[in-house]
Amino acid sequence: MQPSPKVYVEVNVYFTKEGQMRPRSLIWEDGITYGIDRVKAIRPAHAERAGGLGDRYTIIVNGRERYLFFEHNTDFGNQTVGRWFLERREQ
């Protein structure tokens, strides 16, 4: 059985005074923490390989560009705002 192409991760974020959510680091499924060097862009987008829709953050981690997605929760009765995920790299 192949692992899911969508990898949910824990993300350390801060909010600007304008209300923008900015990720600072993420914890990969193996427990390793990666600092986010820079956020290049934020835009609504879908994850092509993993599926899902949300905000796509184009980030730089260790000099490499990656897409980090924030998937909004549409269940307004739930206290969870949403979840972060990355698309697993193809083997």
Model-derived regions, located:
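Cysteine-centric segments in proteins
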Residues: M1-Q91
